[in-house]
């Protein structure tokens, strides 16, 4: 059976895993790393880079490098590169395509299905955007699950007995907290809360601002206005943050960060852990309220929590760990990898859906209340937050005016009492209502939330049976036509990437035979006939002339011609008692010696 890929699509880094032999296994990317930077870049020559390659060139190409795109999922932001605009879904799809391709190379099979995680506090529009990104990347997204829930799956897979756990998930761009009950193969989410714009990126920004402000005081230059300098600051801030998790101080050294009339300027400063903690104190404090809300919604006290699990790279910060310990009165559990456990949980859920993992039932919840706008601009809730999903609930409404023949259903998500203060998910019209005095028609509004947390709404006039149904899509979403266009472009990009990789491999092969041929000419050129030497040099020049071109077939023909001449000459020299290693990647024309087995030589053909 084909593998279903479990994907943690993170703000800063992404990770993937599958079930192998009944157990979750993290898949390394093509570069050999277990996590992949969620970074996309476009070079000035039009090449697209994803992951480590994109991150490495960010300093020299900041304007064409896209980071933390997850924060823009579900919005109408567009990223303009040259004369083309990209949606957040399309950029996220590029990251997913990289993960998909690397997983296929690792597993040796085609991947078509995935389970993707999202922050528990993601809205419906953000979940829809994530699902669309999967489609564009060529993945059927079987399930969208919440990150803290995935972490709990990773933790609870082999646990016996009943436990109430808190998952404190502080990643690169989002914060979630979930309270769950685990026992007898059932993982039930009791409550969830969070902040979709709080994470390690914000910690980095505090360091950036601190360095820039100190530099401004000393030199009167604001480095934040210089895009290349700012990117260097971002890299330095991230490194400093990571180093301060294990060291009490770190040195930030950025030579030639800028220059003025007096010459080049450098940064060489020490950042202590104490100063870093002072810079981020108020940001960490912002996690207190969601934790208290989740506990309150779950009707539990900190004392009733058996285990606190830390998830997300930002929980490696000692100050965060100490804050959680003081807040909950519990020493946080550090027995799972905070960078990988969400992907592992996604793989377990994929295993459940694929039938590879048995006896696990996951009961998740909707993070925010859902309802509609009613008379006076009031938000009337139909499904309360922390309701177990999938779920379906209905409520009867009526008209607000005499003779009203249609009603607009304004669908909202949030917790504020007034409609204008909540997130609009969509609007639709139910018409054809027979004229009647206000308050007489009965209109049944039904909310249906599927296991992905995606909302479907219907409105039905009980008098006529007339009904309207929609799956919520807000104006920030890509239309079906736009999604199909993006899918075609993604397939085109994948084909371009494949051809590019083949071209690079062919050039590498050419480079190898050029090196071997030049070595042969240096070492044994005086043993060749004039004709042999002339032929090899001509074919060597022909290969050098074409190897940096874009025509792969032409390069391959030149390789074949040079290889043939190389072997013709080297075989003759070998038979005369000379030795020379053949070019890598060529076809072995001979063996290890003569047929009598008495020739003993170091001649090799790779």
Curated annotation (Swiss-Prot):
<dbReference type="InterPro" id="IPR012725">
    <property type="entry name" value="Chaperone_DnaK"/>
</dbReference>
<dbReference type="InterPro" id="IPR029048">
    <property type="entry name" value="HSP70_C_sf"/>
</dbReference>
<dbReference type="InterPro" id="IPR043129">
    <property type="entry name" value="ATPase_NBD"/>
</dbReference>
<keyword id="KW-0143">Chaperone</keyword>
<feature type="modified residue" description="Phosphothreonine; by autocatalysis">
    <location>
        <position position="174"/>
    </location>
</feature>
<dbReference type="InterPro" id="IPR018181">
    <property type="entry name" value="Heat_shock_70_CS"/>
</dbReference>
<dbReference type="InterPro" id="IPR029047">
    <property type="entry name" value="HSP70_peptide-bd_sf"/>
</dbReference>
<feature type="compositionally biased region" description="Gly residues">
    <location>
        <begin position="583"/>
        <end position="596"/>
    </location>
</feature>
<dbReference type="GO" id="GO:0005524">
    <property type="term" value="F:ATP binding"/>
</dbReference>
<comment type="function">
    <text>Acts as a chaperone.</text>
</comment>
<dbReference type="Pfam" id="PF00012">
    <property type="entry name" value="HSP70"/>
</dbReference>
<feature type="region of interest" description="Disordered">
    <location>
        <begin position="578"/>
        <end position="606"/>
    </location>
</feature>
<keyword id="KW-0346">Stress response</keyword>
<dbReference type="GO" id="GO:0051082">
    <property type="term" value="F:unfolded protein binding"/>
</dbReference>
<dbReference type="GO" id="GO:0140662">
    <property type="term" value="F:ATP-dependent protein folding chaperone"/>
</dbReference>
<keyword id="KW-0547">Nucleotide-binding</keyword>
<comment type="similarity">
    <text>Belongs to the heat shock protein 70 family.</text>
</comment>
<keyword id="KW-0067">ATP-binding</keyword>
<protein>
    <recommendedName>
        <fullName>Chaperone protein DnaK</fullName>
    </recommendedName>
</protein>
<dbReference type="InterPro" id="IPR013126">
    <property type="entry name" value="Hsp_70_fam"/>
</dbReference>
<keyword id="KW-0597">Phosphoprotein</keyword>
């Amino acid at each position: 059976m084909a593998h279903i890929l479990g994907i943690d699509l993170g703000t800063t880094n992404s990770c993937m895993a599958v079930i192998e032999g009944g157990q979750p296994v993290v898949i390394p990317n093509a570069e050999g790393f277990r996590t992949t930077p969620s970074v996309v870049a476009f070079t000035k020559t039009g090449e697209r880079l994803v992951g480590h390659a994109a991150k490495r060139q960010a300093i020299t190409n900041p304007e064409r490098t896209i980071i933390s795109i997850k924060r823009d999922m579900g919005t109408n932001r567009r990223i303009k590169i040259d004369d083309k605009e990209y949606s957040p879904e399309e950029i996220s799809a590029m990251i997913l395509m990289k993960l998909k391709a690397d997983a296929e190379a690792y597993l040796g099979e085609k991947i078509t299905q995935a389970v993707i995680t999202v922050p528990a506090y993601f809205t419906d529009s953000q979940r829809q955007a994530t699902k669309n990104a999967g489609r564009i990347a060529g993945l059927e997204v079987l399930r969208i699950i919440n990150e803290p829930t995935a972490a709990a799956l990773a933790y609870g897979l082999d646990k016996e007995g009943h436990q109430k756990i808190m998952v404190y998930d502080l990643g690169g761009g989002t914060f979630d907290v979930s309270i769950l009950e685990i026992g007898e193969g059932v993982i039930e989410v009791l409550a969830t809360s969070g902040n979709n714009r709080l994470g390690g990126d914000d910690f980095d920004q505090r360091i950036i601002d601190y360095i820039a402000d100190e530099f401004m005081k000393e030199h009167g230059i604001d480095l934040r206005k210089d895009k290349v300098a700012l990117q260097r600051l971002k890299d330095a801030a991230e490194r400093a943050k990571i180093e301060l998790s294990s060291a009490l101080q770190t040195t930030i050294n950025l030579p030639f960060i800028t220059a003025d009339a007096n010459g080049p300027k450098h940064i060489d400063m020490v950042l202590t852990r104490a100063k870093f903690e002072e810079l981020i104190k108020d940001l960490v404090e912002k996690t207190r309220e969601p934790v208290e809300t989740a506990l309150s919604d779950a009707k539990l006290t900190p004392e009733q929590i058996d285990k606190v699990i830390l998830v997300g790279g930002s929980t490696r910060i000692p100050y965060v760990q100490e804050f959680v310990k003081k807040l909950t009165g519990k020493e946080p559990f550090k027995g799972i990898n905070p960078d990988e456990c969400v992907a592992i949980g996604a793989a377990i859920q994929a295993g459940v859906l694929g039938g590879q993992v048995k006896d696990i039932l996951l009961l998740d919840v909707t993070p925010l209340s859902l309802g509609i706008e009613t008379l006076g601009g009031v938000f009337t809730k139909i499904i309360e937050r922390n309701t177990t999903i999938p779920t379906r609930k209905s409520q009867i409404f009526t008209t607000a005016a005499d003779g009203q023949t249609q009603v607009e259903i304004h669908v909202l998500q949030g917790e504020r009492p007034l409609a204008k203060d909540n997130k609009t998910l969509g609007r639709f019209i139910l018409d054809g209502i027979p004229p009647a005095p206000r308050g007489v028609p009965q209109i049944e509004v039904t909310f249906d939330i599927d296991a992905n947390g995606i909302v479907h709404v219907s409105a039905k006039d009980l008098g006529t049976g007339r009904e309207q149904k929609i799956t919520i899509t807000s104006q920030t979403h890509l239309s079906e036509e736009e999604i199909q266009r993006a899918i075609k472009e993604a397939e085109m990009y994948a084909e371009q990437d494949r051809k590019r990789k083949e071209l690079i491999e062919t050039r590498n092969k050419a480079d190898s035979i050029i090196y071997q041929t030049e070595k042969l000419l240096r070492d044994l050129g005086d043993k060749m006939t004039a004709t042999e030497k002339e032929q090899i040099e001509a074919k060597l020049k022909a290969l050098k002339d074409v190897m940096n071109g874009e025509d792969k077939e032409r390069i391959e023909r030149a390789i074949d011609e040079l290889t043939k001449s190389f072997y013709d000459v080297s075989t003759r020299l070998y038979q005369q008692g000379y030795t020379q290693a053949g070019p890598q990647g060529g076809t072995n024309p001979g063996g290890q010696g003569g047929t009598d087995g008495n020739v003993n030589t170091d001649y090799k053909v790779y």
